[in-house]
UniProtKB/Swiss-Prot annotation:
Role this protein plays: Involved in the cleavage of the C1-C2 bond of 3D-(3,5/4)-trihydroxycyclohexane-1,2-dione (THcHDO) to yield 5-deoxy-glucuronate (5DG).
Cofactor(s), by name: Mg(2+); thiamine diphosphate
GO BP annotations, alphabetical order: inositol catabolic process; isoleucine biosynthetic process; L-valine biosynthetic process
Gene: iolD
EC number(s) on file: 3.7.1.22
Enzymatic class: hydrolase
One function term, GO molecular function aspect: flavin adenine dinucleotide binding
Name of the featured protein: 3D-(3,5/4)-trihydroxycyclohexane-1,2-dione hydrolase
Pathway(s) the chain acts in: Polyol metabolism; myo-inositol degradation into acetyl-CoA; acetyl-CoA from myo-inositol: step 3/7
Catalytic activity of the protein: 3D-3,5/4-trihydroxycyclohexane-1,2-dione + H2O = 5-deoxy-D-glucuronate + H(+)
Taxonomic lineage of the native organism: Bacteria, Bacillati, Bacillota, Bacilli, Bacillales
Short name of any one Pfam family annotated for the protein: TPP_enzyme_C
Length: 637
């Protein structure tokens, strides 16, 4: 063994984080940008002491909620295309438990983040300590075991020397494009402060090379043959295409060979919305244009996609009698889906090499791509100009609320603003290079269908876990990634109530974020779901005990935190608020009261959800029968 240096486990951890670098396409930079922390008795005297003594280049931010700060860390990594991360340090017990939802969010989205929850005593001398759970069947079980199912890598450190192999394994996982996800290292609180003679070589600069995985000649030949044999291929652009940086290759392939592009939520803004062959999002929350193309396709080229139920309309979006699949993915598991021909390789490299193998090919779509795009643009224009009337108004979500109920909402909330009109007003008003973020409720559907991003990587949707509360927290992560851009959280009142603690963190550190709050006084998306399937409007509206609609003054709440706030219930007020918000140096919140049922509906799509097989309600019985009928046309696996 060579020279050693005596450090506590926590001090060794911080030194190691400072020496991790990533190398992609000839560019080398530090991989760990900083650390979010909320100190408690499990980490303040270990990691807290180490950071105070020497944080190195790490930026340290004090979070306000463990889930919130972990979401901020995840959003930063996602926006940086998984090439930089923040670590997250929490105390033992409830602080660690609060990481669970955020870890699941990162895992579902394949986003690297380093989670460092403190753990109970390795010696067990003071057991049970404050915030420790006890199980009769095992003294080894702690709250942190709950993080195992939602971590790509999980370990518990009960000896200082264990840290070395554990960290190397964690960084191997986080820097692997095929496996990237949350790495959780639980460090016993007594071990954090325990000293050990660490080998100095452990702290040498360590470069993690992300070399682009090359396709084999067999894979390229097979892929090219399948494209040439098809007449109507469609490229499904997933998040992997964005992380690979495959924009130019996608455009070239699409333009040259007449292949339309359709997008997943994660893949949106890989290619600009105004690109002629980009038909927008597909599936349950997709455009009619994209869904028409998918329905006619005889080959689906999935580029970096997981084929979630929302992208495939629960496996009903395609004509499976004729459609074949070609999957390009760095993950072998993902490439195997839907009985596809698999190319397990980097998207950018593979698409670039395929381009030269398709000479003379042209799809049979002809003018259909332009026709579908024009048709959808006309529908988008209509949705941007919806106006409410107090008599005979037909909302986008039909046959749920009567005119009287809609009028009741208009009176209670003091608004006549439809959601789609508000959304497209925002799209037309904010700077084109702004980055927008959303996650849950009806807004992701509206955004995937309607939002035009004409600057790459400016559309940030967390729709793998669709975690309520990600929207505001994640906006802080966006601002850390893009300090010179305007960043906007598009969030419903339900998600805002679920979690918005990191708005205070943004204000504390003068990281300007803009919160655009759509308040329809309820869980509107799920209300649509229940009523679409035969149930009544049951506990999804925000109503008082005497059935009055809640009207919360969210602008006043944010004003109390120190944000610049606005109330905008008309298009004119919204435009004025957006323009003024651009001039502010402090975080802003624009509260919009919007009418329920004025979000977009589905376009030639279907979602398989559980419906009661037995019910006293005829409407539920009909919904169940309709579901069973639709399933007959769905692929079984």
């Amino acid at each position: 063994m060579g020279k050693t240096i005596r450090l506590t486990t926590a001090q060794a951890l911080i030194q190691f984080l400072n020496r991790q670098y990533i190398h992609v396409d000839g560019k080398e930079e530090p991989f760990v940008e900083g650390i979010f922390t909320i100190f408690g008795h499990g980490n303040v005297l270990g990691i807290g002491q180490a950071l105070e003594q020497d944080a190195g280049h790490l930026k340290v931010y004090q979070g306000k909620n463990e889930q919130g700060m972990a979401h901020a860390a995840m959003a930063y990594s996602k926006q940086m295309l998984r090439r930089k991360i923040y670590a997250v340090s929490t105390s033992v017990g409830p602080g660690a438990a609060n990481l669970t939802a955020a870890a699941g969010t990162a895992l579902a989205n394949h986003i690297p983040v380093l989670l460092l929850p403190a753990d109970t005593f390795a010696t067990r001398q003071p057991d049970p300590v404050l915030q420790q759970v006890e199980q009769e069947y095992s003294a080894a079980v702690t709250t942190n075991d709950a993080l195992k199912p939602v971590s790509r890598y999980w370990d518990r450190i009960t000896r200082p020397e264990q840290l070395m192999s554990s960290l190397i394994r964690a960084f191997e996982v986080m820097t692997d494009p095929a496996k990237a996800g949350p790495a959780t290292i639980c460090i016993s609180q007594d071990v954090e402060g325990e000293a050990f003679d660490f080998d100095e070589s452990f702290f040498e600069k360590r470069v993690h090379y992300i070399d682009r995985m090359q396709p084999s000649e067999r894979e390229l030949k097979g892929a090219a043959e399948r494209i040439k044999q098809s007449s109507r291929p469609v490229i499904l652009v997933g998040g992997g295409a964005k992380y690979s940086g495959a924009r130019e290759e996608l455009i070239a392939l699409s333009e040259t060979y007449g292949i339309p592009l359709v997008e997943t939520q994660a893949g949106k803004s890989t290619v600009e919305a105004d690109f002629a062959n980009n038909l927008g999002g597909m599936g349950i929350t997709g455009t009619l244009a994209a869904n028409k193309a998918a329905r006619q396709a005889d080959l689906i080229i999935g580029v970096g996609t997981r084929y979630t139920d929302f992208a495939t309309s629960s496996k009903t979006a395609f004509d499976f009698d004729k459609a074949k699949f070609l999957n390009i993915n760095v993950s072998r598991m993902q490439a195997y889906k839907l009985d596809a021909f698999q190319v397990v390789a980097d998207a950018k490299v593979t698409l670039g090499r395929l381009h030269g193998l398709l000479d003379g090919y042209k799809s049979a779509f002809g003018t259909a791509i332009k026709d579908w795009k024009d048709e959808w643009q006309a529908e988008r224009d209509r949705l941007g100009k919806v106006t409410f009337t107090r008599d005979a108004f037909e909302p986008e979500i039909k046959n749920h609320f009567s005119q009287d109920v809609l009028n009741e909402y208009a009176d209670a909330l003091g608004t006549e603003l439809p959601q789609t009109t508000a959304l497209l007003t925002i799209n037309d008003t904010i700077p084109e290079d702004s980055v927008v973020i959303s996650s849950a409720g009806s807004l992701p559907g509206d955004l995937q269908r309607l939002w035009h991003s004409n600057v790459p990587n400016t559309y940030h949707l967390e729709y793998g876990y669709s975690c309520m509360g990600y929207e505001v927290s994640g906006t802080l992560g966006l601002k850390l990634a893009h300090p010179d851009k305007e960043v906007y959280s598009l969030v419903g009142d339900g998600s805002f109530l679920m979690l918005h603690s990191e708005l205070i963190t943004a204000l504390q550190y003068n990281k300007k974020i803009n919160v655009l709050l759509f308040d329809n006084s309820g869980f509107g998306c799920i209300n649509n779901l229940q009523m679409d399937h035969g149930s009544g409007s049951y506990f999804c509206e925000f109503r008082t005990e005497d059935n009055q609609i809640l009207n919360v003054d969210y602008a006043k709440v944010a004003e109390g935190y120190g944000a610049k706030t606005y109330r905008a219930n008309t298009v004119e007020e919204l435009k004025a608020a957006l323009e003024d918000a651009k001039t502010q140096d402090v975080s802003t919140l624009i509260e919009m009261k919007v009418l329920p049922k004025t979000m977009t509906d589905g376009y030639d799509s279907w979602w398989h959800v559980g419906v009661a097989e037995v019910s006293e309600q005829k409407s539920v019985q009909r919904a169940y029968e309709a579901k069973e009928t639709k399933l007959k046309s769905a692929k079984q696996y």
